[in-house]
Structures are given as C-alpha cells and as structure tokens.
C-alpha cells in the first residue's frame, strides 16, 4: 500500500483519489478551500454538465488541444463509465440536447454529494483548508532523476507520500481558488508550462445596442465570424446577449476555436436569425406578414419575427421609420430588412478575462507527461491530471470528461 497525496479537490482530484483508494492505497486529498468541488458547483449554470454521451469520435474531435494525448485516458475510462459511476453512486442522470448529460435533479450539489459519498466509502482522508506551498523531492536512485516524496503546506506542515497527484485546475473562475498553483509546482519540478489563456469565454462587442438586449437568449441561429473576408467560425446553435457583448454555447465554442492572437482583434460577426430559410424564402415570409399587417405601423408588424427585446434594435438598424405604415414600405427597404435578419451585425472586441472563462487554454506540456499513466517523465511518482495539463475542449461536457478520465488514470497508475 502506497501513501498517495492528491492536491486539489475538484473533479480530476476527487476521481484520482477514488481510483487510487479503490486500488488499495492510502489516500490523502488536500483542498485549500473550505469545501470540495467549489468550481464544479457553478459549472453548467449550477446544473453541472457531467459529460457528453456522444461516440468516441465526437469525444476526440471536441478536444481542441492535444487530443492524441487523451487516447489512453479516454479508452481507459470513457463517458459511459462516468455515467455508470454516478448512477451507481445514487445520482440519476438525464440526456439533453447535444448529448449533454446532467443530473436529473439539475443540481450540481448532488454531483458533489455523490462524489463525497464514494470518497467516504473508500476511506479517503479529506483535509480542507490545506494549501500546499511546495512539493518535496529526493534522489530517485536513477541517473539524474529525482522523485517526489511529499508536500509542504503553507503552515509549514510536511506530509510524506510515495506518490503525489497534482489536480489543481487552471486559472479560470479564480474566485473558486483556481489560482494556478499547479503551474508553479510543475515549473519547480522542471516542467514546461505553455502559455496560459482564458478559453470558453464570452466576447466583448463594440455596439451599444447589445445592452438593450441583455439577457436575451437566441436559439436555432447561425453565427458567422469573419476576419476581413475570411470566415473563422460558422456554426448553428444557441447564444446569449449580455451587457458587454455576447456569450452562450456558440460564442464560448468560438472562443476556443479562434486563435487567441486573432481573437484579440476586432472581428466582424453576423447572426442569421432565420437560418432555416433562404433569403428568397424569408422575403416571401416577410411579404406575407406585411400583407397581413398592411395597415399597421412598422413597429407593430414584426412581433412574429423576433423576441420583444430585439424589436427596437431591428427597427433602428433597418433604417425604416417605426411609425411608417407597412403598405408604404418600399421593396428596397423590405429587402434591406430581410438582409438584416439574415446577417445581424456585431463587431467583436476581444475576449473577457479569466474571471469569466469556463476553462484555461494552456498548461503543463503534455510531451513531458506519460499519456498511458499521467506520470511526469521528469520526476518519478509525480502525476498530473485535469485542467492543469495543456488540454481543453469545446463546451458540452467534454472538459469534465477530460477531468474524469485523466484523474481516474492517474489514480489507477500510482505505484
């Protein structure tokens, strides 16, 4: 039986602790916050998108960075195993649009409670308010290679260990304690940490009219983002207007797919509000609506086309006098209005910061970590898992799957 210390009580850390304990080791889980799963509690707007039930090809293709590194981890512990784990732990789950898996209760607290029940059953020693200051090392006996032998806490206490698993998360949602401690531990161990940037993060928008639509969610729209004439992103789905710009699944995914240096630039964005219709079909629909409302003012004739919050903005951008009678609207004005519906314009003005990022892009360089075990190639008995690694995926439960899979593999492979 080895003494295993896991640093970080998030999803990867809890799964690593459970796997190591169920493999016969004595496990101490160190968490610097007052409770486990503080960031997990707020994921998925407090509902916790546990994983995604799509097939393995979709799983891999949803990983944006270093997907090949995850072959062993995903095949050793896949999404169905995650679903089975939680159901066996007393947490019923449900499958929603896009194969996103949520607890039936819609409460992330129930996910954390299920994990805590398993940690207790497996006799994992949980120590809260326990911030690690540094890792401890000794000579491994192998030429030029050291091994980790424990940790020192911020209060000076030393905890001896045969294996240490670093599962400290990234820099996103720093109010939950994600302050990048693991990057420092990795650098002190001799590891390379790639550039750290926010990902799955909203965009700022230049136009003031976004504020008029704050809180408005648009479903079944198509978003296209341009750099000059080049299309950088073109996807169908759901988005949200905020007081500063745009957010929601489509926008968060765009932030992960557009190169960070380019995302800093002003970029043109168009929203197709009626993607199921061609411009010609939409014109016929608008003509029909106008015919039915021919004696009404323009401002009172378009309620069937848009949510109420959007109508004043659409009127303003159309250039049509809101008090104009519908039967006085010219063909040119109507066609301009149709084009506006098919290409609602915004100017993106860079990404929001880490405090609003769901995940971190960048981390411990994966070429320095064994993908079959999650053990450091530089320091014996030191393991990394979860967001501290240079791994990230699009929104939809895929980032938590990375955490579960890499955490489980690290816990299973401690010696």
Kindly give the residue locations of the regions a language model identified.
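Short hydrophobic core segments
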Residues: 5-7, 132, 158-174, 187, ...
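A conserved short coil-to-beta-strand element within the FAD-binding core of flavoproteins
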Residues: 128-147
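Glycine-rich loop(s) and the adjacent beta-strand/alpha-helix scaffold that form part
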Residues: 163-209
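A conserved FAD-binding loop/helix module that cradles the flavin
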Residues: 172-185, 189, 390-415
């Amino acid at each position: 039986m080895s003494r295993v210390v896991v640093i970080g009580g998030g999803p990867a850390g809890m799964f690593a602790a459970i796997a190591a304990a169920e493999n016969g080791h004595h496990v101490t889980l160190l968490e610097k916050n007052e409770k486990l799963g503080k960031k997990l509690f707020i994921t998925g707007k407090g509902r916790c998108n546990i994983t995604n039930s799509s097939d393995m090809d979709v799983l891999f293709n949803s990983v944006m960075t270093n997907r090949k590194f995850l072959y062993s981890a995903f095949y050793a512990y896949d999404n169905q195993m995650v679903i089975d784990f939680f159901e066996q732990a007393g947490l019923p789950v449900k499958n929603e649009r896009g194969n996103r898996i949520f607890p039936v209760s819609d409460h992330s607290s129930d996910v954390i409670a299920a994990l805590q029940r398993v940690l207790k059953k497996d006799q994992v020693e949980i120590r809260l308010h326990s911030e690690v200051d540094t890792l401890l090392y000794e000579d491994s006996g192998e030429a030029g290679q050291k091994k980790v032998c424990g940790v020192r806490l911020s209060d000076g206490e030393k905890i001896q260990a045969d294996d240490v698993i670093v599962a400290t998360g990234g820099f996103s949602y720093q109010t939950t304690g994600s302050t990048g401690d693991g990057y420092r531990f990795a650098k002190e161990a001799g590891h390379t940490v790639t550039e750290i940037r926010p990902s799955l993060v909203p965009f700022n928008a230049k136009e003031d009219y976004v504020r008029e639509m704050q809180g408005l969610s648009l479903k079944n729209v198509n978003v296209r983002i341009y750099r000059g004439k080049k299309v950088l992103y073109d996807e169908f789905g759901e988005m949200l207007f905020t007081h500063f710009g745009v957010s929601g699944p489509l926008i968060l995914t765009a932030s992960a797919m557009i190169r960070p240096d380019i995302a800093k630039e002003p970029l043109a964005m168009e929203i197709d509000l009626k993607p199921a219709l061609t411009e010609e079909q939409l014109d016929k629909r608008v003509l029909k609506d106008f015919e039915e409302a021919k004696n009404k003012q323009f401002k009172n004739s378009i309620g069937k086309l848009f949510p109420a919050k959007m109508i004043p903005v659409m009127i303003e951008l159309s250039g049509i006098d809101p008090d104009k009678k519908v039967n006085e609207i010219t063909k040119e004005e109507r066609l301009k209005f149709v084009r506006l519906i098919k290409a609602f314009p915004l100017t993106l003005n860079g990404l929001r910061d880490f405090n609003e990022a769901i995940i971190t892009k960048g981390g411990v360089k994966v070429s320095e970590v064994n993908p079959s075990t999650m053990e450091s190639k530089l320091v014996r008995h030191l393991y990394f898992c979860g967001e501290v690694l240079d791994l990230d995926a699009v929104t939809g439960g895929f980032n938590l799957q990375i955490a579960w899979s890499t955490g489980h593999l690290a816990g299973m492979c401690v010696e």
